[in-house]
Amino acid sequence: MAAGFGRCCRVLRSISRFQWRSQHTKANRQREPGLGFSFEFTEQQKEFQATARKFAREEIIPVAAEYDKTGEYPVPLIRRAWELGLMNTHIPENCGGLGLGTFDACLISEELAYGCTGVQTAIEGNSLGQMPIIIAGNDQQKKKYLGRMTEEPLMCAYCVTEPGAGSDVAGIKTKAEKKGDEYIINGQKMWITNGGKANWYFLLARSDPDPKAPANKAFTGFIVEADTPGIQIGRKELNMGQRCSDTRGIVFEDVKVPRENVLIGDGAGFKVAMGAFDKTRPVVAAGAVGLAQRALDEATKYALERKTFGKLLVEHQAISFMLAEMAMKVELARMSYQRAAWEVDSGRRNTYYASIAKAFAGDIANQLATDAVQILGGNGFNTEYPVEKLMRDAKIYQIYEGTSQIQRLIVAREHIDKYKN
C-alpha cells in the first residue's frame, strides 16, 4: 500500500512541477500584472477533481446510508482515499506529501462531501490536526509526524475544544505544567473529531497559571502521541448527523509530553491554533457546498420524475423557483470558498474571506437540505431517500470550526477595522 501511495505522490508531484494549478499560487511567487482572475481549471486540476468525484459517486454513495445507520468508522473508504492521494494533501513535498494548496484541497473536499460529509469530515479532520505543524512545526517535527502519514493511512486530531470552552477558545482549562524538560498535562477535551482513531493529537493547553495572562501568551501548543500513558479516550458520541465520523471526549491525566513536542515555544499556542483556521475554514466551506450541491441534484432529479396535479413538479412555478433559488445559493457559496482559498494561497491574510465562506456555505447547506426535503415531501422525510440524511448532516457546518455566529463576529470586526484604519 505504501508503495502505491509513493507512486501516486511521485506522479502528482511531477504534475505540480508543470504548473499543475492556475488557482493555487505559492506565497513567494510573483504574479504577472494584468492577468486578472481565471475561472478555468487546468486539465490536471480537472483530472484530480474527476478522481475525487468518481470515488465519491462509485464508492462512497453506495455505502453512505449503511455507515450512517451503523455509525461505523469508514476505514475502507479512508484507506482508499489515501491510496488515491485524496488525503493529507497539505503535507509538504519535503515530508513526502503533495504540498498542495488550500484551493486544491477545496476541490477535493467538495466532491467527497457530495458523497458523504461524515467521510469527508473524517478526512478533513486530518488536515485540521496537521495544520498547526505545517504552519508552525520545525523540520524535525514535520518529518516525524507528517512524514509518517505519507507512509501509511494514519489519522490525527485537533484537540482543543472542551466541555466548557467551544467558541471561547481562550476559556480552556486544560493545564500544562513545566517540569524540567517535560510538561505535565491535565484536563478534559470534548467533541474531538478522529479522537478515538488518531495516532497523535495537536493539543492546546494553558501553560501560564496567571488567570489574567492574555490569550496570546497564556497557551502552548503540543504534539501528543495518542498512546502516551494517562490518556483516556471516551466513548464514541452518537450525533445527529455525520455519524460515521469518530467524535469523542478525551481525558488527560498527568500526561507527560517532552519539550521537543512544543510548537514554536511557550505561550505561542493560541496564535498557532487560530492560524490553522485561515487554511482549513475554506475547506470546511467547500464540504458544505458539496452537501448543498447534492441536495440540489437530488431535489431536481425528483422534481423531474414526480407528477402532481397532472404535471411534473418542475412544471409548477413554485417548485421551479425553489430550484432556481437553490442553484443561485450553491453557486455563490462555491465562489465564496474559492475566493477564500485563492487569497490564502496567494500569500495574503484571508481571515475575512475564510469566515465569510464558512458562515455563508454552512447556512446555505442547511437551507438547501431543508428545501430538498420539502420538495420531496413525505419521501424527503423518509430514510429510503438520501435528503433526510443531508438535512441531519448539514447542521454541524454551522457549529464546528467556529459557529456561524462567531464567523459573523469575525467578519464584522474585520469589516469595521478597514474603515477605522
Curated annotation (Swiss-Prot):
Binding site for octanoyl-CoA: S167, D278, R281, R349, T351, E401
GO molecular-function term, one example from the UniProt record: medium-chain fatty acyl-CoA dehydrogenase activity
Family annotation (Pfam families): Acyl-CoA_dh_1, Acyl-CoA_dh_M, Acyl-CoA_dh_N
InterPro entries: Acyl-CoA_dehydrogenase, Acyl-CoA_DH_CS, Acyl-CoA_Oxase/DH_mid-dom, Acyl-CoA_Oxase/DH_mid-dom_sf, AcylCo_DH-like_C, AcylCo_DH/oxidase_C, AcylCoA_DH/ox_N, AcylCoA_DH/ox_N_sf
Pathway in which this enzyme or protein is active: Lipid metabolism; mitochondrial fatty acid beta-oxidation
EC number(s) reported in the record: 1.3.8.7
Phosphothreonine: modified positions: T351
Catalytic activity: a medium-chain 2,3-saturated fatty acyl-CoA + oxidized [electron-transfer flavoprotein] + H(+) = a medium-chain (2E)-enoyl-CoA + reduced [electron-transfer flavoprotein]; pentanoyl-CoA + oxidized [electron-transfer flavoprotein] + H(+) = (2E)-pentenoyl-CoA + reduced [electron-transfer flavoprotein]; hexanoyl-CoA + oxidized [electron-transfer flavoprotein] + H(+) = (2E)-hexenoyl-CoA + reduced [electron-transfer flavoprotein]; octanoyl-CoA + oxidized [electron-transfer flavoprotein] + H(+) = (2E)-octenoyl-CoA + reduced [electron-transfer flavoprotein]
Residue span of the annotated presequence: 1-25
Modified residues (N6-acetyllysine): K69, K212, K217, K271, K279, K301
Processing after translation: Acetylated. Could occur at proximity of the cofactor-binding sites and reduce the catalytic activity. Could be deacetylated by SIRT3.
Record GO biological process: fatty acid beta-oxidation using acyl-CoA dehydrogenase; medium-chain fatty acid catabolic process
Top-level taxon in the UniProt lineage: Eukaryota
Binding site for FAD: 158-167, 191-193, 306-308, 316-317, 374-378, 402-405
CDD domains referenced in this protein's UniProt entry, alphabetically: MCAD
Enzyme class: oxidoreductase
Alphabetized SUPFAM superfamilies for the sequence: Acyl-CoA dehydrogenase C-terminal domain-like, Acyl-CoA dehydrogenase NM domain-like
Family according to the record: Belongs to the acyl-CoA dehydrogenase family.
Cited function: Medium-chain specific acyl-CoA dehydrogenase is one of the acyl-CoA dehydrogenases that catalyze the first step of mitochondrial fatty acid beta-oxidation, an aerobic process breaking down fatty acids into acetyl-CoA and allowing the production of energy from fats.
Subunit and interaction comment: Homotetramer. Interacts with the heterodimeric electron transfer flavoprotein ETF.
Protein name: Medium-chain specific acyl-CoA dehydrogenase, mitochondrial
Organism: Pan troglodytes
Gene that encodes the chain: ACADM
